[in-house]
Amino acid sequence: MLDFLAANPLIALAVILAVGLAIGRISLFGVSLGAAAVLIVALVVSTLNPDIQIPAFVFQLGLAMFVYVIGISAGPAFFREFRSRGWKLTLFMITLLVSLTALAWVLIRAFGLGAGAGAGMFAGSLTSTPGMAAVVALMDPAQAGDPVIGYSLAYPGAVLGSILVAAVGAKLLKVNHTEDAREEGLVTEPLVWKGVRIGEGISGTIGDLPRLSGQQIIATRIVEDPHEHRLADPTLPIKPGMELVINGTVNAVDRAIAALGGECDTKIEDTELVYSRFTVSNPDIVGRTVAELDPVANGFMIARIRQGDTEIVPHRDTVLNYSDRVRVVAAPGRMGEVRRFLGDSEKALGDVNLLPFAIGLSLGLLLGAIPVPLPGDTTMYLGFGGGPIVAGLILGALNRTGPITWQLPFHANRTISTLGLALFLAGVGTSAGAGFRQALTDPQSFVYMGVGFAITVTSALVCAVVGMWLLKLKWDESMGVAAGATTNPAIISYLNDQTGTDLANRGYATVYPTAMIGKILACQVLFLLL
């Protein structure tokens, strides 16, 4: 059977994906490996028969797809967060890499490990394929295999070590993933509506209500009388005694009512306005903000937006994306026009336009291929991991360029992300298996494995301690930073599967570009110091 798989790489890839994804769904003590199990299956299969190899372009394409989609999704939050605290995480990542390089130098010297294999082991402990390649570029061709062996020995422990820290730490600290995400504003409370009567001394426009109340709310209706409502145009002035219907979380609405005046008894049934939900599928409005769409001018108000599993109160800068579910308020006679304006077509969502994805991925790969000169007549490349995520972050933040919408529908985003990750893990697992099997015959191989594992665990623990107690991050975001330090998709995939929130993704995307470039430099510096 193994010889058959070795002779048929495509079938081998399919089998590894099927078995790995099946094992990844098995939960043991509340923990499942998810897509990371594909790596283990690939490593085991190729260790049993080193001739089982997936072509390199398969995992290169998979990694590029995965990190590009991560970048697209995290782009808007990345630049917003960087202005507030992202620079702190970037500075921490630089300090961490310098410290880990020093630790690796001490351990390699203490255990008498070879310079090439030791630098490769360091790259493997941080799962940096570009870092390992950069070390190979500095070496004599006759010894170029040493970093590859060191990398292969440390790589499996690097993946499992970070996952182990994340799993054990979450259990010991009794982490409530949902509550942590809620406190960070990534999980919203159920939204409600109530009537508010504006009190004396409150002045401004309806659009000023969030600022005046200090709460994230939106007014959707002006109550003229119990049976006559009209749309709450944000430009209209407010005045004492005006009655409005506002939307928001329970706490936000109650606090807003207390700040603006008092609650009034209001009913939304049997009025001249009704509400309905539509799905955004019109490519002409995707990637545009609520302010750009000017819904009031089109005869409706957007009361709520459901993005994935999260329902939010929109503001003027909220961007509409494919597959968002929008709750609108409008006159009954205008609902058909509103439906056409938003799209509301499941067929349109199924016909995913992959042209923007292909353009963005191509730009990322081209960016990764640009040589960056370094001291010592060496050259650095962002590669097929760094280039696409940088391009994704930029394009994701732009949302839209002319007629091109960079964002993908939610389900397409998740599908491409999972497929890319699985392809990467299957390919890199089989490529490491051959060297792994050969190296296991040498007792010193276990020293390389142990030292690499120690560096990985140290990195994750430092991220946890500094992240939670110094940078005041939640556990999941700290582990996202740890995953970003290793730039390993398997770890972030595990975190996403276990937490069900975007906290880990936020930390991962913030530090990924710095870690990607920093590790290449760190591996080269370590080799030169040895």
Swiss-Prot record:
This is Uncharacterized transporter CE0595. It is found in: Cell membrane. The chain crosses the membrane at residues 4-23, 28-47, 57-79, 91-113, 148-170, 352-374, 379-398, 419-441, 451-473. It is a multi-pass membrane protein. Residues 260-344 form the RCK C-terminal domain. InterPro entries: AAE_transporter, RCK_C, RCK_C_sf, Transaldolase_AS, YidE_YbjL. GO terms for biological process: carbohydrate metabolic process; potassium ion transport. One of its GO terms (cellular component) is plasma membrane. It comes from the Bacteria. Pfam families: Asp-Al_Ex, TrkA_C. PANTHER family: K(+)_H(+) ANTIPORTER SUBUNIT KHTT, TRANSPORT PROTEIN YIDE-RELATED. It comes from Corynebacterium efficiens (strain DSM 44549 / YS-314 / AJ 12310 / JCM 11189 / NBRC 100395). Its main location: membrane. Belongs to the AAE transporter (TC 2.A.81) family.
